[in-house]
Curated annotation (Swiss-Prot):
Lineage start: Bacteria, Pseudomonadati, Pseudomonadota, Gammaproteobacteria, Enterobacterales
EC supergroup of this enzyme: transferase
Protein name: tRNA N6-adenosine threonylcarbamoyltransferase
EC number: 2.3.1.234
Keywords carried by this UniProt record: Acyltransferase, Cytoplasm, Iron, Metal-binding, Transferase, tRNA processing
InterPro entries per the UniProt record, alphabetical: ATPase_NBD, Gcp-like_dom, KAE1/TsaD, Peptidase_M22_CS, TsaD
The gene coding this protein: tsaD
Amino-acid positions noted as binding substrate in the UniProt annotation, renumbered to this chain: 134-138, 167, 180, 272
Protein source organism: Escherichia coli O157:H7
Length: 337
């Protein structure tokens, strides 16, 4: 069984083909980073127009990469939400049109379920149950996962997501968009302990997050200490340490609450090397395991949508020919498979 996956929720156009016996057969990705760089963030209208230009050519490239033709595809999966409404509509329209033309089912996929299941693409996939840390530019959530579609929200950010805080703080430090990875690179040159940022909401019970205050703290620190290269690196280090420590503390609480021994990290920020190292060390001490996808599958991609579509297709999920998307779509609303 082969599923074509289409990802167009934000500023990456991702197309992939997944075979339930052979694994990933094709993976094509186009990033719009250069398109949005001058604006310091994603411009929704530009994102939608670029998806229109890139989606069909990438589908053709994926078919060529896999050596398949349209008649070899058994279902078409597409991201139906959450995300930018215009961008989502491009992928949904193309996906449903192809499904109709090829006479195969169309499978709407939840973007964050795609991220959550991305580690399943690896050679050593996690088994249920586990705690999932979904950490990206738009989401920071802790989820109890006991099966496909069996998701319980344990905590989430009440303001900025961790990835958003990374990008905003990077901009304060004069870094280009997207600044999160550049901030992490700068932080590697910083001196630990010169500046100490707060660990938000760790001094009270609960599993919710708040990262907007760290951006303000960074702005004040920059104002008071100048912007020479070493100072900027030291501020970046302090900021990253604060975010990573906060995420680690909350993960510990979630694992204690659930009693689970497995932790899954997913989303763009899960590619952060410092976060990976700290959580791996933490889970080793707890005699547990941590799982994450390879870096290219942490950010938005078609492979995770193709895989999630395969899982949902086997569970009987299909969509009619109407085109509808959900820019806001709580993960907990998904049915169990």
């Amino acid at each position: 069984m082969r599923v074509l996956g289409i990802e167009t929720s934000c500023d990456e156009t991702g197309i992939a083909i997944y075979d339930d016996e052979k694994g990933l057969l094709a993976n094509q990705l186009y990033s719009q980073v250069k398109l949005h760089a001058d604006y310091g963030g994603v411009v929704p209208e530009l994102a939608s127009r670029d998806h229109v230009r890139k989606t069909v050519p990438l589908i053709q490239a994926a078919l060529k990469e896999s050596g398949l033709t349209a008649k070899d595809i058994d279902a078409v999966a597409y991201t139906a939400g959450p995300g930018l409404v215009g961008a989502l509509l491009v992928g949904a329209t193309v996906g449903r049109s192809l499904a109709f033309a090829w006479n195969v089912p169309a499978i709407p996929v939840h973007h964050m379920e795609g991220h959550l299941l991305a580690p399943m693409l690896e050679d050593n996939p996690p088994e249920f149950p586990f705690v999932a840390l979904l950490v990206s530019g738009g989401h920071t959530q802790l989820i109890s996962v006991t099966g496909i579609g069996q998701y319980e929200l344990l905590g989430e950010s009440i303001d900025d997501a961790a990835g958003e805080a990374f990008d905003k703080t990077a901009k304060l430090l004069g870094l280009d968009y997207p600044g999160g990875p550049l901030l992490s690179k700068m932080a590697a040159q910083g001196t630990a302990g010169r500046f100490v940022f707060p660990r938000p909401m760790t001094d009270r019970p609960g599993l919710d997050f708040s990262f907007s205050g760290l951006k303000t703290f960074a702005a004040n620190t920059i104002r008071d200490n100048g912007t020479d290269d070493q100072t900027r690196a030291d501020i970046a280090r302090a900021f990253e340490d604060a975010v990573v420590d906060t995420l680690m503390i909350k993960c510990k609480r979630a694992l204690d609450l659930t009693g689970f021994k497995r932790l899954v990290m997913a989303g763009g920020v899960s590619a952060n090397r410092t976060l990976r190292a700290k959580l791996a060390e933490m889970m080793k001490k707890r005699r547990g395991e941590v799982f994450y996808a390879r870096p290219e599958f942490c950010t938005d991609n078609g492979a995770m949508i193709a895989y999630a579509g395969m899982v949902r297709f086997k569970a009987g999920a299909t969509a009619d020919l109407g085109v509808s998307v959900r820019p806001r779509w709580p993960l907990a609303e998904l049915p169990a498979a």
